[in-house]
């Protein structure tokens, strides 16, 4: 099968979140299954620097001269095309946000360009001599590809993956006009969303198959609580909507071979995990007390991640035998709260604002407990890393967290099936109670070791998930023009 994978970020070329991890791992896993997968992404300066000596191919699109840089995804044999349009993508830093933290004012134009080039690529109008059977689109940045493809008589099948429904690519009507999109697309059944242009609706309406990155999230987004105003549309496409759990890069995230760890370890050498805890503590000047558990947290400091719940219980945590290590960035007020707490109690709380890949690995290995109290979580990766590293996650029962962590109930503990602590209401008191539960288990070394080993035994590799995506692609191919789309893709203006 020939698959074009389109994403606005791909690890290790550009990363702001889990989308990049998926885009850097899934194509390689599909290739390993024997499929011809090729990636298209913007040529950000960082991506060009990280790419392996790309070849430049000149092309024209809508009267503009553009360049397609042809290379390979680093560390793989997967072909990678970088869309080199300096006026749109030649900016260092966050690919979506300007230095002042506001979205780039031309984001609609930038990602409409990516969509148009993707469509031309699928129709072999760029002279590459290759046409995909399936186009796999990811999040709002690729949302215009499905509706633009609907005008093509020999289009490929389209799969649209929702990594986070909260980010929708909303722009005023004037942007719709400026992009010169077909007038027929300006209606409620297409791209119009309460008077605005919605990129994500393009994927949700026109794709042959839609999926989210966990089964629970696929169910949740059909409800008003999690549907972000699109739950009615998603319910109407329920027969074409499914959830496939993300995998993880089990080579990069392997405690037995992790180059970032001072003491690699496995299920049979779990005691070496304590060496990593000691090194983590030394990095921050935290006392090395075996009776004190280290709580770790890595991620964006935003309300979605439940960071405010943790901030609300900081005073209570300080009454417990724990230390807290936090790595992340986001909401400036949340950042300041953690910085103030660390300054006031440096022997108990350590914070690094920003992102540091080696440190993220060390926290996963050195922490005893990992905190992930998300308000919503399409899939989540850190709870998967934590279990692989024998670090017990505390998670909220939502989205991919609910699908991947087995709560340490008495029944599951007795059956050897418990891998973490799960709580439900998004309230500080319930997070604190979950910490109490974790510490009670921590005080029973044999029980604790069993929970750690249960998580380490799970298979979260991309091999399993990639096979499910192949099945989804086949469904999309079979379902083309079979009445699955709620909008007739060839309706008149």
UniProtKB/Swiss-Prot annotation:
Keywords: Glycogen biosynthesis, Glycosyltransferase, Transferase. Its EC number is 2.4.1.21. One of its GO terms (biological process) is glycogen biosynthetic process. InterPro entries: Glyco_trans_1, GS/SS, Starch_synth_cat_dom. ADP-alpha-D-glucose binds at residue 15. Transmembrane segments: none annotated. GO terms for molecular function: alpha-1,4-glucan glucosyltransferase (ADP-glucose donor) activity; alpha-1,4-glucan glucosyltransferase (UDP-glucose donor) activity. It comes from the Bacteria. The keyword Glycosyltransferase applies. It catalyses: [(1->4)-alpha-D-glucosyl](n) + ADP-alpha-D-glucose = [(1->4)-alpha-D-glucosyl](n+1) + ADP + H(+). Pfam families: Glyco_transf_5, Glycos_transf_1. It is an enzyme of class 2 (transferase). Pathway: Glycan biosynthesis; glycogen biosynthesis. GO terms for cellular component: cytosol. NCBIfam families: glgA, PRK00654.1-2. Belongs to the glycosyltransferase 1 family. Bacterial/plant glycogen synthase subfamily. Synthesizes alpha-1,4-glucan chains using ADP-glucose. This is Glycogen synthase 1.
């Amino acid at each position: 099968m020939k698959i074009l994978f389109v994403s606005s970020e791909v690890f290790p070329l550009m990363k702001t979140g889990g989308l990049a991890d998926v885009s850097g791992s899934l194509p390689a896993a599909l290739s390993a299954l024997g499929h011809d997968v090729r990636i298209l992404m913007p040529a950000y300066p960082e991506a060009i620097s990280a790419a392996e000596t790309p070849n430049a191919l000149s092309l024209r699109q809508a009267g503009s001269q553009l360049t397609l840089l042809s290379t390979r995804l680093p560390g793989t044999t997967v072909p990678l095309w970088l869309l080199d349009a300096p006026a749109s993508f030649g900016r260092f830093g966050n690919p979506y946000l300007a230095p002042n933290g506001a979205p780039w004012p031309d984001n609609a134009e930038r990602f409409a360009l990516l969509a148009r080039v993707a469509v031309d690529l699928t129709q072999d109008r760029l002279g590459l001599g290759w046409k995909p059977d399936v186009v796999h689109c990811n999040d709002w940045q690729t949302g215009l590809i499905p509706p633009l493809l609907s005008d093509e008589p020999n289009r490929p099948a389209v799969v649209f993956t929702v990594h986070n429904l909260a980010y929708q690519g909303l722009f005023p009507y004037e942007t719709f006009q400026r992009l010169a999109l077909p007038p027929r697309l300006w209606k409620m059944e297409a791209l119009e969303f309460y008077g605005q242009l919605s990129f994500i609706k393009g994927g949700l309406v026109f794709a042959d198959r839609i999926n989210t990155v966990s089964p629970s999230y696929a169910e949740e987004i059909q409800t008003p609580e999690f549907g972000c105003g699109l739950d009615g549309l998603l319910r109407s496409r329920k027969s074409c909507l499914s959830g496939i759990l993300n995998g993880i890069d089990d080579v990069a995230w392997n405690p037995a071979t992790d180059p970032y760890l001072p003491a690699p370890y496995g299920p049979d050498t779990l005691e070496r995990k304590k060496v990593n805890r000691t090194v983590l503590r030394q990095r921050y000047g935290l006392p090395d007390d075996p009776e004190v558990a280290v709580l770790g947290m890595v991620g964006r400091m935003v309300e979605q991640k439940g960071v405010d719940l943790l901030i609300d219980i900081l005073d209570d945590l300080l009454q417990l035998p724990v230390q807290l290590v936090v790595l992340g960035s986001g909401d400036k007020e949340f950042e300041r709260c953690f910085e103030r707490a660390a300054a006031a109690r440096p022997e108990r709380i350590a914070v690094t604002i920003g992102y540091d890949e080696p440190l993220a690995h060390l926290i996963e290995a050195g922490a005893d407990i990992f905190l992930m109290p998300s308000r919503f979580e399409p899939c989540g990766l850190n709870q998967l890393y934590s279990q692989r590293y024998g670090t017990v996650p505390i998670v909220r029962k939502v989205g991919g967290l609910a699908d991947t962590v087995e709560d340490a109930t008495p029944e599951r503990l007795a059956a050897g099936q418990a891998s973490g602590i799960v709580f439900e209401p998004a309230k500080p008191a319930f997070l604190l109670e979950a910490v109490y539960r974790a510490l009670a288990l921590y005080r029973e070394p044999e029980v604790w070791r069993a929970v750690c080993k249960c998580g380490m035994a799970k298979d979260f590799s991309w091999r399993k998930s990639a096979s499910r995506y192949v099945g989804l692609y086949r469904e999309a191919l079979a379902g083309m023009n079979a009445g699955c789309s709620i909008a007739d893709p060839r309706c008149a203006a």
